[in-house]
């Protein structure tokens, strides 16, 4: 696996952000959908390559003050800008999904889908685990997750 930033790195980055003004950012929980099936069909080597490629394409796509960390297997956390203009934010999330789905690697092009939970960071800062938990709950409890190739949902504090 390539040198991917991990959860410990993201915790430090998140805590730095909390010291300033975290408003205008969101915490994103992202999982590659049907990863276990992909891994069984194509083997662990291709599964590892997929994990790396998703990380690479998102890391290149994100703005310079946004970040991604590989947590484990097919699970990533991101810190991204969050606009008050929902239409603009939705377009950005759709574009992010497109970056994953249409990555310029023939073996995966058009076949990789994701589920995302988005937790807008509140004015009153929450700790890393609370932000992660809220984004995870949002992703896991999204009513569209079983009906869509890719999905995302936005929740506030639970």
PLM region spans:
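Conserved long alpha-helical elements within nucleotide-processing catalytic cores of c-di-GMP signaling
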Residues: 2-26, 33-59, 69-73, 87-90, ...
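Catalytic-core segments of nucleotide cyclases and related cyclic-nucleotide turnover enzymes
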Residues: 7, 11, 15, 86-97, ...
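Conserved hydrophobic/aromatic beta-strand scaffold that supports enzyme active sites
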Residues: 27-29, 118
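Short, conserved catalytic or interaction motifs in soluble domains
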Residues: 40, 81, 144
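Short catalytic/binding micro-motifs of nucleotide second-messenger systems
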Residues: 60-65, 96-109, 141-143
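A short glycine-enriched loop-to-beta-strand structural element that forms part of the catalytic core
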Residues: 70-81, 106-139, 148-156
């Amino acid at each position: 696996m390539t040198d991917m930033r991990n959860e410990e790195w993201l915790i430090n980055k998140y805590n730095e952000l909390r010291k300033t003004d975290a408003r205008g950012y969101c915490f994103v929980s992202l999982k590659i959908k049907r990863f276990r099936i992909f891994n069984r069909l194509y083997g662990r080597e291709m599964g590892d390559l997929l994990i790396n490629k998703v990380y690479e394409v998102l890391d290149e796509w994100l703005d310079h003050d946004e970040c991604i960390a590989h947590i484990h297997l097919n699970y990533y956390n991101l810190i991204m800008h969050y606009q008050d203009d929902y239409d603009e934010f939705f377009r950005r999330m759709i574009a992010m999904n497109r970056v994953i789905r249409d990555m310029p690697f023939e073996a995966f092009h058009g076949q990789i889908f994701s589920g995302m939970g988005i937790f807008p960071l509140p004015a009153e800062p929450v700790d890393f685990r609370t932000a992660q938990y809220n984004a995870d709950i949002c992703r896991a409890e999204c009513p569209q997750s079983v009906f869509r190739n890719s999905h995302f949902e936005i929740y506030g504090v639970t």
